[in-house]
């Protein structure tokens, strides 16, 4: 199935807060979302990571499944799919999720994509929408969004797969759920973006760097990016740039050990400028280098930088 890009959100209500009493070695991932958004590909990615995978388990059986995983000798990580085929039972999901979280550390991952992308995928695969052949796909998508709203509202991660292909979705799942043994195993993503394209939904921390001088208005810098040495030197020469880098680094070095202590396995720190080409790219690269020197697992991603 064609293409799936990301998003993440942590809910603060009781239904979305994993119990801290559960051992970190055991976990359940509930995979849900819109038809055509890539649940099948994501499920295979979880299987490749060693998760015990179940497709479309009835909602009423999820608490019992969680108990079996919690008691199992062989299964320590499991994922299951809940989708629109559950019908009216979907309204019960938030309550059932609270029950499951009393048994097992649980993460809800909700996959979605833009309407245009979903329509293209259904057209390319020639598969009917699960809500019916006779209904226009555009109406079926709208109906499905409404039915799945209770699940989306309690999701820990909302992943927009519009920009992903199958391989990129697989890599994204692996980057978020691969386990490492060292104390700094949390994966930190320093992401640049352009505000004109919206704030990344998977960002945990967002910094607006539009206060920095903009290289876009200097003709020789306009076709370059924040990874080019000339642009880097230009942005770095300003005192506010150096002060900002130092203060953000100091803040992150304070925050990161606390995130690790709370069991967080991934963190996305996003830096935004107008277009996502110069300032945010330079800052994301520099912060990633600084954190890497402190032995954190870190990578830089540039959502909107021209390639």
Curated annotation (Swiss-Prot):
Keywords: ATP-binding, GTP-binding, Nucleotide-binding. The keyword Ubl conjugation does not apply. It comes from the Bacteria. GO terms for molecular function: ATP binding; GTP binding. Residues 1-14 have a biased composition (Basic and acidic residues). GTP binds at residues 83-86. The keyword Magnesium does not apply. InterPro entries: P-loop_NTPase, RapZ-like, RapZ-like_N, RapZ_C. ATP binds at residues 33-40. Residues 1-23 are annotated as: Disordered. Belongs to the RapZ-like family. NCBIfam families: PRK05416.1. Displays ATPase and GTPase activities. This is Nucleotide-binding protein ACP_0619.
């Amino acid at each position: 199935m064609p293409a799936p890009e990301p998003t993440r959100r942590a809910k603060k209500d009781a239904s979305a807060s994993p119990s801290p009493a559960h051992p970190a070695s055991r976990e359940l991932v509930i995979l849900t979302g819109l038809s055509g958004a890539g649940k099948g590909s994501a499920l295979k990615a979880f299987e490749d990571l060693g998760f015990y995978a179940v497709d479309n388990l009835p909602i009423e059986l999820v608490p019992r499944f969680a108990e079996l995983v919690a008691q199992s000798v062989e299964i320590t990580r499991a994922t299951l799919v809940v989708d629109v085929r559950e019908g009216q039972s979907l309204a019960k999901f938030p309550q059932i999720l609270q029950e499951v979280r009393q048994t097992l550390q649980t993460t809800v991952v909700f996959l979605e994509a833009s309407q245009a992308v979903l329509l293209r995928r259904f057209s390319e695969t020639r598969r009917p929408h699960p809500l019916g052949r006779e209904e226009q796909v555009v109406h079926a998508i709208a109906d499905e969004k409404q039915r799945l709203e209770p699940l989306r509202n309690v999701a820990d991660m909302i992943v927009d797969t519009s920009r992903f292909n199958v391989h990129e979705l697989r890599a994204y799942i692996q980057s978020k759920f691969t386990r490492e043994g060292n104390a700094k195993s949390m994966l930190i993503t320093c992401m640049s973006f352009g505000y004109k394209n919206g704030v990344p939904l998977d960002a945990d921390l967002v910094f607006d760097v539009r206060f920095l001088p903009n290289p876009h208005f200097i003709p020789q810098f306009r076709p370059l990016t924040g990874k080019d040495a000339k642009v880097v030197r230009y942005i770095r020469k300003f005192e506010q740039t150096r002060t900002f880098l130092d203060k953000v680094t100091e803040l992150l070095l304070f925050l990161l050990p606390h995130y690790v202590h709370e069991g967080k396995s991934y963190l996305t720190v996003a830096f935004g400028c107008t277009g996502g080409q110069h300032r945010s790219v330079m800052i994301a690269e520099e912060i990633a280098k600084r954190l890497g020197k402190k032995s954190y697992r870190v990578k830089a991603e540039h959502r909107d930088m021209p390639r």
